[in-house]
Amino acid sequence: MGKQRAPSAAAAGGGRDPTGLGFRRGPPPPPPPECDGKPKVNYVTVFERPGLHEFLKRISEFANLILFTAGLEDYARPLVDRMDKDNVIGERLYRPSTVSTEYREHVKDLSCLSKNLSRIVIVDNNPFSFLLQPLNGIPCVPFSAGQPYDDQLLVVLLPLLKHLSLQRDVRPVLYERFHMPEWFQMHGIPTSGNGV
């Protein structure tokens, strides 16, 4: 029997508290000595979460990686290109693939990936991103450049995703671990109809 692969929708990039990348907006760097004198636009400094490349490589050994971000493609694509140096992300979904609900905009509806959600997982630092499928979501601690020793990807998420890849249905395991339907209800969002 061959190894089963569990599709995994990993949200990373774009936003103030990203899953895999940290951003800092600021003034442009000082001009080079031979500057043409034209004003420069602001720039964004990107900090990769520690272990990001190893995490993506190891996950790709047992899961199909899909990047699903609420970021606009023109902005997010260059960041994702940088993040995915080994080309392990199979598909990229940007803001036009998100939906608006009565509670939030830019929600990632996993039903666009498959009608059968028993083996689909979304990892996101913003739980509201997966409010339509709370039983498929793994809330991730946000990353910022001020956390150079962050081990969330390799120590916390990788073992959990490996464990989930062995399950016929990830939702009961994720419910036991995170109780996301109750979390959404505490935040005023009903989750009826999203059960296993």
Predicted features by range, described:
Residues K40-L65, S100, R104, S111:
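Short, acidic loop-to-helix structural element flanking the phosphoryl-transfer center
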Residues R16, P32-E34, G51-K85:
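Conserved, ordered domain cores of eukaryotic regulatory proteins
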Residues P32-N42, Q147-Y149, L153-L154:
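A solvent-exposed, charged loop/short amphipathic helix patch at secondary-structure junctions
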Residues E61, L72-V196:
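C-terminal cap/substrate-recognition subdomain and adjoining C-terminal extension
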Residues M1-P32, H187-I189:
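Long, acidic (Asp/Glu-rich), low-complexity accessory segments flanking structured domains
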Residues G37, R49, R177-F178:
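Generic detection of intrinsically disordered/low-complexity segments and helix-coil linkers/edges
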